[in-house]
Amino acid sequence: MKDYSMTLTALRSASALAAALLLAPALAHAQDIVRHKIPNSDFPIALAVSIPPSATIHFISGQVPPIVDKAADPNAIAAFGDTKTQTVGVLQKIKEILAGMGLGMGDVVKMQVFLVGDPAHKGRADVTGFMAGYTQFFGGAQPNLPARAVMQVAGLSNPGWLVEIEVVAAKK
């Protein structure tokens, strides 16, 4: 009778290796960042975002708009533009910060937006203007949506600012 113990051990090792190779993609997929959609909605935010322990999380401080009219009073809305203009300026700054870290807007998993009531909108935050700027960066060509909160605040540290945005980004 032949000794099959070495052959049996080799077969078991090969089977274990094959199983590991077959399961590896499933395990890697289980570790992906998951964006949970809002049921029955096409609104461009995520209901929630799940981040695996293998991801690195980056907290980006609140960013404010750049000056768009250097001739205007630097403490006036005219210096920074309307809510849409300010939103685009702030998100462009965030995009540049992320790029400097090897990240992109698709890596943003959480966003907090602070909008000041706009005198041109009877003291209410211009959410329509904000969304017009926001959707240039999220929900179109770049489909990854963050969990997001938008709140109206009494004011920001410069009376010309209508928008401040802070984000959290994550990448495996």
Spell out what each predicted region is:
Residues 12-92, 96-112, 118-172:
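N-terminal presequence-like segments and the immediate start of the first folded domain
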Residues 1-10:
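N-terminal secretory signal peptides that target proteins for export/translocation
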